């Protein structure tokens, strides 16, 4: 990890995921687009997360989060971002691709078949090119209780841990 709060994607320590809460900036959504949220006028709206797993209690609001990732390696990295709160209404991940963003959309307001990864939680694949450094954004909307347990996994470690979990659950 870098002192500035940038998470270095390679190597991730051990097989455990990294909890992203300590690296997140959080801002209340005022109906802005990704273009507006990434602009310099909105940058000061992002505040550090109040806890490793931010908890908003009962709400019907939407929030933006952002976190920096870096891949200092000459090889690409395959990662997974997991939102371990399967009852969120709308979850969006914005991954920088040049000057634009690739948008993943998920949440219980959408059919399961539209998920980027068929999983009980919201999971998004993120491919970091060599020497990547950039900011990823997420938008969350929820009516009801709302907390954000968001994890960053190495893709292989995610799949291995998920297979083991399914095996254990299947044995009951």
Predicted regions and their residues:
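Soluble non-transmembrane domains of integral membrane proteins
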Residues: 7-165
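Selective detector of the "anchor" transmembrane alpha-helix that sits immediately C-terminal
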Residues: 165-172
